């Protein structure tokens, strides 16, 4: 009996090490740590926010963006986290990715992660105890966990994109990454290309629904006394080369205009010349590296303070 008990303790300790150390840089884990404090400014959104925002230490801000996320879950995170973590009158940056209006997102794109970071009240009938257990006790559900623990003990925690400060790709390689991104969008959203403004009828229907969600998020911020700011993050010159003005207007700007009925501040950096240099990106064409994120966020804070005066 004592042997079984001892083995159980060892396994639980391994899980805690795996959860708190090996996975410490996972966005979900950063979010959980971020929920322990109060801030003057917070950001919500998807991958473009995750790899676009890095608040300087003296700014008292936190980035709650999560990769592969659409407005459905962003809305839930905003409503649960802002009252808990944002100081009265604080700023809410709503990061709007190029194709974020193209999908509502319910039950899609790693939705099993949300029971770890959102309450049962927020998720309603989507809440799954099994998914919570999978996320909270990952050692028991990952056959590679022991190998990852050993690698972490030897080499240290994997920081991924967190510390990358230079794009190791040349322009042609970065352009190829941009083309791959656009091709994946065409596959995912059934687009002909990223040059025309003609899109499928079903996408128009999703635009209508996602615009309503964004309008609701803006209204929530006003009702709670927060300062919402809509933000389109920059992408490199290589990425911009692959997207026409007509396409971006159709899938992004027209939807922002439709959703922003309260005319809240909108800061658009998509083609901003200050952030076109490919050296600011993380071995791709549209995710800023650590240096680029910090430079951009400093400018974002300055600009948002200016427009609020």
Give the label of every model feature segment.
Residues 18-38:
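Alpha-helical transmembrane signal-anchor/signal-peptide segments
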Residues 206-283:
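Extended hydrophobic/aromatic segments used for targeting, binding, or gating
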Residues 38, 87-91, 225-227:
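A general structural motif
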Residues 282-309:
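Histidine-centered active-site loop/cap adjacent to the catalytic His
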Residues 48-136:
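Membrane-embedded segments
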Residues 109-224:
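Secreted/periplasmic serine-hydrolase-like ester/acetyl group-modifying domain
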Residues 40-46:
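Short, hydrophobic beta-strand segments that form beta-sheet elements in well-ordered domains
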Residues 1-16:
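Hydrophobic membrane-insertion alpha-helices, especially the h-region
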């Amino acid at each position: 009996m004592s042997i079984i008990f001892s083995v159980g303790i060892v396994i639980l300790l391994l899980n805690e090490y795996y959860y708190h150390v090996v996975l410490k840089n996972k966005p979900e884990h950063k979010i959980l740590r971020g929920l322990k404090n109060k801030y003057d400014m917070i950001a919500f959104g998807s991958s473009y926010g995750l790899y676009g925002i890095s608040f300087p230490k003296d700014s008292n801000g936190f980035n709650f963006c999560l990769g592969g996320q659409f407005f459905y879950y962003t809305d839930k995170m905003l409503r649960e986290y802002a009252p808990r973590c944002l100081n009265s009158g604080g700023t809410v940056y709503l990061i709007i990715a190029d194709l974020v209006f193209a999908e509502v997102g319910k039950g899609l794109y790693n939705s099993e992660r949300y029971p770890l970071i959102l309450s049962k009240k927020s998720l309603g009938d989507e809440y799954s105890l099994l998914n919570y257990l999978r996320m909270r006790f990952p050692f028991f559900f990952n056959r590679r966990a022991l190998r990852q623990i050993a690698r972490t003990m030897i080499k240290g925690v994997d920081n991924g994109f967190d510390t990358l400060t230079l794009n190791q790709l040349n322009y042609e390689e970065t352009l190829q990454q941009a083309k791959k991104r656009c091709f994946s969008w065409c596959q995912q959203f059934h687009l002909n290309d990223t040059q025309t403004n003609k899109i499928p009828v079903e996408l128009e229907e999703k635009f209508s629904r996602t615009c309503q969600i964004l309008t609701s998020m803006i209204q929530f911020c006003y009702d709670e006394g927060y300062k919402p700011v809509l933000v389109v993050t920059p992408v490199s010159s290589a990425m911009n080369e692959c997207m026409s003005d007509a396409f971006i207007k159709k899938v992004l700007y027209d939807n922002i205009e439709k959703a922003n009925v309260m005319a809240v501040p909108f800061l658009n950096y998509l083609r901003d010349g200050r952030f076109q240099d490919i050296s600011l990106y993380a071995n791709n064409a549209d995710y800023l590296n650590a240096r680029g994120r910090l430079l951009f966020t400093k400018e974002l804070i300055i600009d948002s303070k200016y427009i609020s005066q």
